[in-house]
Amino acid sequence: MSSALIVGDLQAGILDNYPFTKAVVPPVTELLPRARAAGVLVVFVRTAFRANGADLAGEVFAAFHRQGDLFHEGAPGTEVALEVTADDVVVLKRRTSAFAGTDLDLVLRARGVDSLALTGVATSAMVAATFYDASDRGYGLTVLRDGCADQDPAVHEFFVDKIFPSRGAEILTCAEWPAPSRTRGARTAPR
């Protein structure tokens, strides 16, 4: 039984162009070495689309793609903005959820991970979509309140105060996680 820390969409282009995202950088940056020292698998998830748009589905993704290189695969804006170590995993996604069309579940299962702590932006998008996918797959879930943000703070608060707890998630701050129980094995969601 082990845990993974999911760090979603904290990439250069997003941090540079969406001011609300900057608030999560200090607590997540402080958390990373503690999580690694506790034996937690750190997984960075980034978003990028093919330059020719072959992987676009729907207007939301097309709108991101039209922003130019900001979301084009291989562009500097799609690179993880925080320090990535050799033991970390980086997953490329082309949809909102970190699980949709990626090998994230395969990596987590191969490492014996049964519990996830979620951070990233935006709370109502990447974090929520990944949360629902992870819950459906039977992972125990913790959402790190100050490690997530949304353009509308009220939406963020609604998710972390109402939605995520109603689905069985533990809500903590980055400073409170990983608790000792998380490194030895965390509770899992009902399967």
Describe each model-derived feature in a short phrase.
Residues A4-L10:
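Acidic-leg catalytic submotif of subtilisin-like serine proteases
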Residues N17-T21, V155:
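Short, solvent-exposed loop/turn segments at secondary-structure boundaries
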Residues K22-T29:
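Short, well-structured N-terminal submotif of metal-dependent ribonuclease cores
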Residues M1-A4, E30-A38, R66-R191:
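Active-site-adjacent betaalpha module
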Residues A51-F71:
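Acidic/polar short surface loop at catalytic or gating sites that assists cofactor/ion binding
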Residues A12-D16:
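Short acidic, Gly/Ser-rich segments with clustered Asp/Glu that frequently serve as metal-coordination loops
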Residues V7, F44, V143:
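Short beta-strand "acidic-cap" motif of Rossmann-like dinucleotide-binding folds
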Residues A35-A54:
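Von Willebrand factor
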